[in-house]
Swiss-Prot record:
Transmembrane segments: 3-23
Organism: Euglena gracilis
Membrane-topology annotation of the record: Single-pass membrane protein
Record's function text: May play a role in photosystem I and II biogenesis.
UniProt family annotation: Belongs to the PsbN family.
Top-level lineage group: Eukaryota
An example Gene Ontology biological process: photosynthesis
UniProt name for this protein: Putative protein PsbN
GO cellular component term, pick one: chloroplast thylakoid membrane
């Protein structure tokens, strides 16, 4: 049981870190130029 819990902890940590890196990449990476900024569009 110790090996299974050890591997699941590593897998969960890797999953959280990869999701965070992916969200930062989607927010600030090359795809961010296609995203529209709602504050820039709303000018009076």
């Amino acid at each position: 049981f110790k090996i299974i819990s050890f591997l699941s902890t590593i897998f969960l940590g890797f999953f959280i870190i990869s999701t965070t890196i992916y969200s930062i990449y989607m927010g600030f990476g090359p795809m961010s130029r296609k995203l529209k900024d709602p504050f820039e569009e709303h000018e009076n």
